[in-house]
C-alpha cells in the first residue's frame, strides 16, 4: 500500500491534513489521490480543533475503523508517518527538504504537536540541536529589573503564554510568535545574546512559530535546565528538560 500525504497548517493552530492511498499498480496510473477504479483506493481529510479532537471526511473504499491507531503526526515542519512496518520521515528546514526512508517498524504514539514547539522533537533524547542566526543585542531594560507590562495577551496554552507569566509579565505582551521574540526584545531594549542564565528566556526561530522556554538554571557543566509549555505534550502542558552546553549555544537568550 503506497500513500501520498499532503499537510497544511493554519496559522491559528488548526491543522488540516489530507491522505490518499492506493496499491503500487494503481499508483502508476494515478499518483494524485483517490481512484474510483481501484478497490483499495481512498482519500480522507481531517481537521483538529482547539481541543485536539479529530474530525474526518472520507472518500473511496476505506473507512475510519481501518485507520492504524499507532500513527504519530508531528506538526511544525517535522512529520513522521508509520504505515505497514515502513516509516517515512520528512524534515523541513526553511527552503531545504530532506527525505529519509527506512523499512524498520517503529513504535509510535498519538501525540499532537501544535504551534510553538520549536526545534525538531526527538523521542530518544531530551536534547535538541538547532541553528540560529547571530542574536541581536541591546541594552537598557532587563527581565530581572523590569516591571509588569500588563495583561498576558498571548494565546493560552502556548509557549509564549507560559513564559510571559513565568517572568512575571516583565516583557512585552505583543511580541508575536516565539520566532519574533529575539528581535522584538532587542528592539525594546532587552539584552539578547547566546549566553544562558537563570531567569532568562531561551528562544529559537526553528519550527513553524518558533519556540521559547524559561531558563530555570545553568549547571556546573554548562548544561541548561528549562521549563516550557506545549513542547512535545500538547497545548497547556508544562514540562522541563536539560539541554547540553554545546546545544545551548545555538539558542538565543533574552535577559
UniProtKB/Swiss-Prot annotation:
Origin organism lineage: Bacteria, Bacillati, Bacillota, Bacilli, Bacillales
Protein name as annotated: Staphylococcal secretory antigen ssaA1
Domain of life: Bacteria
Ranges: Sequence repeats: 75-78, 88-91, 98-101
Chain residue ranges for the region called 3 X 4 AA repeats of Y-N-N-Y: 75-101
Main localization of the protein described in the UniProt heading: secreted
Cited Gene3D superfamilies: endopeptidase domain like (from Nostoc punctiforme) (3.90.1720.10)
Native source species: Staphylococcus aureus (strain MRSA252)
Signal sequence annotation: 1-26
Keywords: Repeat, Secreted, Signal, Virulence
Alphabetical list of InterPro entries matching this protein: CHAP_dom, Papain-like_cys_pep_sf
Annotated GO CC locations: extracellular region
Stated role: Not known; immunogenic protein.
Subcellular location: Secreted
Domain Peptidase C51: 134-255
